[in-house]
């Protein structure tokens, strides 16, 4: 059975959806651990309640990205993952970290890449006047939000959408995993 480590920074809504899918009999993987760069991330409580190993490693405790990523890699490696999923992990990873896990590191991004990389994707979609928005699962490369696409899911952008409403449309029924 494949082992997955999930990295989060907040409430873990994508992680929660993965936990639900992982509970299905036919899912060929085990979520081995959830790790957050925010010690008070609400998603850690959700993972603990589901019986999943959790850890927090505060990026503010490290003077630079390289040292943080090295410590994060040590923590990840303790769980011997086959796959590392960035599910709302709000840190840009160093090329060293990305290269270490190349081909095993995927991201869940809240837009239809290559459109709207980076932050505030829902507002970007509304401002651009697009009629559809969505989410992308892609392999992580050193270039932000540019790795090969694995899957995408589409939702309509409604005329009265705000950034918060767009978040709701994209959240549950259209997750691309």
Predicted regions and their residues:
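N-terminal Rossmann-like dinucleotide-binding module
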Residues: 1-42
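Short, glycine-/small-residue-rich phosphate/pyrophosphate-handling segment
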Residues: 118-150
């Amino acid at each position: 059975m494949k082992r997955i480590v999930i990295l989060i920074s907040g409430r873990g809504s994508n992680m929660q959806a993965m936990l639900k899918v992982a509970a299905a009999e036919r899912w060929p993987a085990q979520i081995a651990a959830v790790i957050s760069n925010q010690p008070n991330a609400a998603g850690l409580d959700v993972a603990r309640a589901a019986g999943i190993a959790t850890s927090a490693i505060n990026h503010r405790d490290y003077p630079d990205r390289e040292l943080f990523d090295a410590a994060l890699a040590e923590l990840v490696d303790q769980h011997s993952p086959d796959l590392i999923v960035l599910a709302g992990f709000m840190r840009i990873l160093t090329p060293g970290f990305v290269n270490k896990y190349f081909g095993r590191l995927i991201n869940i991004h809240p837009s239809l890449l290559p459109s709207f990389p980076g932050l505030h994707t829902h507002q970007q979609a509304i401002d651009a006047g697009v009629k559809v928005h969505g989410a992308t699962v892609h392999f992580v490369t050193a270039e932000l939000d540019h790795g090969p696409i694995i899957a995408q899911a589409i939702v309509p952008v409604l005329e009265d959408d705000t950034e918060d409403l767009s978040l709701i449309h994209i959240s549950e029924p259209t997750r691309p995993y």
